[in-house]
Amino acid sequence: PPNALMLCGVSIVDPDSTYVDDTVEVGPDTVIHANSHLCGQTRIGEECTIGPNSILVDTVVGDRCQVFASVLEQAVLEDDVSIGPFGHLRKGAHLATGVHLGNFGEVKNSYLGPGVKMGHFSYIGDAEIGAETNIGAGTITCNFDVKGRKNRTRIGKRAYIGSGTMLVAPVEVGDGAVTGAGSVVTRSVPARTVAYGVPARVHGTVEQG
């Protein structure tokens, strides 16, 4: 299969260390680096860079995406998404156009809207995140309660989630809202307000600074 892809305009840097199932589709002008595994019903668009050291299983990737040293399972990437190094997308992860997921970020059963930035050390599970929101380092959605139930987190557009924020689901953060570093959010945060503390409380609006 690597040789067949190369005949279709795909660049494979090291065919001997690249593993591609017969069922995989890859668009022209995509580059696949060494030690990459493309498995199952994976479909990759045009002008992407995959690897090195990446595993994609049953994953759909749009055009001009970058996946570096990461594992993607049953996920969807729209166009111009960048992941890695050491990112992990699990079943049901959907990253919209222009999303960036950096090192040691994990997403499961969640939608990240266009332009969302999630730079480092975060877990987003069972969540919906609006466009252009920034997820600070160490942010965690606490989605699994003591009764074994999975609960959802909803974050609006252009919100700013401070580093080390714990979002105890079910909870909602409104459009343009801000959470301070180290906050434990147990109650919903209204749009364009600032919340911080343990537990987090609203201390004013964004306009008030």
Predicted regions and their residues:
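Extended, small-residue-rich solenoid/repeat segments and analogous flexible loops
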Residues: P1-A69, L77-P85
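Glycine-rich hexapeptide-repeat left-handed beta-helix
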Residues: V67-G209
